[in-house]
Amino acid sequence: MTQYTPMIQQYLKVKADYQDAFLFFRLGDFYEMFFEDAVKAAHELEITLTSRDGGSSERIPMCGVPYHAAKNYIEQLVEKGYKVAVCEQVEDPKTAKGVVRREVVQLITPGTMMEGRTIDEKENNFLAALTHFEDGSYALACNDLTTGQNTVTLLTGSVEDILLEVYATGSKEIVVDSSFSKDELNKLTETLKMTISYEDATAIPEGLEHLVKNVSQAKLIKAVGRLFNYVIRTQKRSLDHLQPVEIYYTNQFMKIDVHSKRNLELTETLRTKEKTGSLLWLLDKTKTAMGGRMLKQWMERPLIQKERIEERLEMVETFVNDYFLREDLKEKLKEVYDLERLAGKVAFGNVNARDLLQLRRSLLQVPAILEAISLLDNAYAARLIQGADPCESLTELLGRSIQENPPLSIKDGDIIKDGYNDKLDQYRYVSKNGKTWIAELEKRERDITGIKSLKIGYNRIFGYYIEVTKANLGALPEGRYERKQTLANAERFITDELKEKETLILEAEEKIVQLEYDLFTALREEVKVFIPKLQHLAKVISELDVLQSFATVSEEEQFVKPVLTTKREIFIKDGRHPVVEKVLNGKLYVPNDCIMPENMDVFLITGPNMSGKSTYMRQLALVTVMSQIGCFVPATEAVLPVFDQIFTRIGAADDLISGQSTFMVEMLEAKNAIANASERSLILFDEIGRGTSTYDGMALAQAIIEHIHDQIGAKTLFSTHYHELTVLEDSLDQLKNVHVSAIEENGKVVFLHKIQDGAADKSYGIHVAQLAELPDSLIARAKEVLAQLEGQEEIVIPKRVEVKAQEQEVIPEPIVVKEEPIEIEETKVDNEEESQLSFFGAEQSSKKQDKPALDAKETAVLTQIKKIDLLDMTPLEAMNELYRLQKKLKKG
């Protein structure tokens, strides 16, 4: 390192502590980057890569950005998942001896960004910290640096459960210890696309102990300690706005796994990953940024406590029924800025005068809001506003201190009102009168010289001057002015009198700017005292905003208040998919009932493609979520239980698990539901088994249906193209066939989008192909092939084999191999015996025929089957073993 110049040596020393970040190294008016940072930054930011002499034999790669434009470049890098260490000059270069002293003043990361275009005003920017313990449990702590919010929870489930909870936070960055499992880190980065950071310190930092007073569990304290230590190490500034840590328990909320949330498009669409077109987009009628953030948090964690849900519903009903109250509240909320993030900026010391003006305007609305809510005869409303302080003294302070139209910068003056500070008023008097004198001098000199174009101007280099065009120089009295500067078309002069006034004016103006800055920073410290009250107020206003948002959308879209029941029954009359209905924008939407009494657990749904099966299934899930976040629902009547979990497998999700096939994704999602669902869960399976051969798919579909029906008892919508499965209605007493109706008119299919009882009689696949405008010749050929296939043998679903519950694992009997042969009912067609296919694809002979002798290969496979311990295998392992044996039999 000694071969480099002292400045480059200094750079390398600082860089050694920030190997995983771009180092923005301040040199004068630029932030410079060197070596690999420069090469990579030039590529990512599309800026010029140059080089400089650094003392070594080879030139050093270098690139840089102007300091005043650095914010934009830093945002670009952080948006791409990088970290940026900002290294500033911490001493005056004019007085420095040797190399100017420099220090990193902040490490900016995806989870610690405070402002900029990467921070959506209606989304939290959570930083997560995950701690793994020897007993297999995890503690997850989260902090939103922009709002000061802190949460922590203990997780004891699988890695998938951990992923679900981290996903629910929306975190872009997660902090772990340096020994954290690499496999688990890979899942976080691949599935959730997160930036990984490391922090080994877990003790609560000095000065922050008061934030964990309500946290007693050592595991939770460790997770919070890791989080706080990382924040302090990276931010290096005041954290006065951090709020007390809130403990929450995941079993207090409905569980919806990561893939189900995406399938249902709760907060973003599958295709575009955008909010528009999601349920959140429809429900978001909030008027404040903080209300928008709370709405998203509620949607990520629907409630499962009936009483809490009903409290919200009653409050929404109050707003629905009182139009004037609702509209008045909305008008006031429009004037409320982001109190949470304003408080954060105050604490961080980067609040400006305009921010404080926004704070004052917000606080002016608060007394009327609190008074209106206090008049409601509602226990929830009374509890909500209890302890809310309108901060009227702060409103008064800001009202008499901050100008109505202050500049963005706090270093340019013109911030503080007249009358706030006596000394400032005196300086302003001198400055103002001095400028009046300058204007009078200009008029007097014009009169004396007769030069109408004479003017008095000012610049920072020469100060005040008298400017005369060259055409008028001859009119000047000789010796009146002292020449100061020559321009192309004019001459500039000064006088002793002008210089005297200039000194008085400039001294006053300099003192004004400095005093205003000092007064503003003192004011900012006074505002800091109110941060806890502002944060409490923000929570109250956010919650009111979400509730009025629910009321507004419910009124606009004609939603109804759901009735919650402790019974396991669903009664939805004229239910609609809220987002599809909205997107149709006035076109007729066909509503559908969903009526599942306590003794009805499974709807087996058949019908053609494009008929609306998936929409109907999603519709039920969205109605359920809306109900349990406290919103009215799209129906004319709704009676619903409180579900503990929602599981889905509904198309378009094949890319969600990296590197997995469609069929594997199906099986993994099916396994998740089967392993975790309870009788209080909702399961939505769309076309399970489509990713493999017909017989395998049908076998698995039947087995899954039977297992859910017999062993779980969850309310389930199961759509299928295997029409043969509809006979299960005869043997499963809590299963009912329903179908989406369609009719043919003039050889073309017309989808009615109406759910009706019974099984569908046709799939209309070729008609759908016609709608897609496939070539006529291809359609004609498909019809010929279909006619041939329909004339062939019929597939018969095997009878169920009753097995005791303890003998079953996840996939029930039709695919469980036993030593005794399974009797398969025979069907006769045209008085001829029809041979049937078993679930292994091997042809079974009619009972009237003698069983053929097994060859050596078949005997070997049978021996292997007998040795399989099915009770010690997962469904996926059983399926893989089945494929292996089948493949072995098929080899010639």
UniProtKB/Swiss-Prot annotation:
Listed PROSITE patterns: DNA_MISMATCH_REPAIR_2
Please give one Pfam family short name.
MutS_II
Gene3D superfamilies the UniProt entry points to: 1.10.1420.10, DNA repair protein MutS, domain I (3.40.1170.10), MutS, connector domain (3.30.420.110), P-loop containing nucleotide triphosphate hydrolases (3.40.50.300)
Its cellular-component GO annotations read:
cytosol
Entry binding sites for ATP: 607-614
InterPro entries xrefs: DNA_mismatch_repair_MutS, DNA_mismatch_repair_MutS-lik_N, DNA_mismatch_repair_MutS/MSH, DNA_mismatch_repair_MutS_C, DNA_mismatch_repair_MutS_clamp, DNA_mismatch_repair_MutS_core, DNA_mismatch_repair_MutS_N, DNA_mismatch_repair_MutS_sf
Sorted alphabetically, the keyword list is:
ATP-binding, DNA damage, DNA repair, DNA-binding, Nucleotide-binding
What this chain does, per the entry, is described as: This protein is involved in the repair of mismatches in DNA. It is possible that it carries out the mismatch recognition step. This protein has a weak ATPase activity.
PANTHER family annotated for this entry?
DNA MISMATCH REPAIR PROTEIN MSH1, MITOCHONDRIAL, DNA MISMATCH REPAIR PROTEIN MUTS FAMILY MEMBER
Family, according to the entry, reads as follows: Belongs to the DNA mismatch repair MutS family.
Q: Which NCBIfam families match?
A: mutS1 (TIGR01070), PRK05399.1 (NF003810)
Its recorded name reads DNA mismatch repair protein MutS
Can you name the source organism? Bacillus anthracis
Designated gene of the protein: mutS
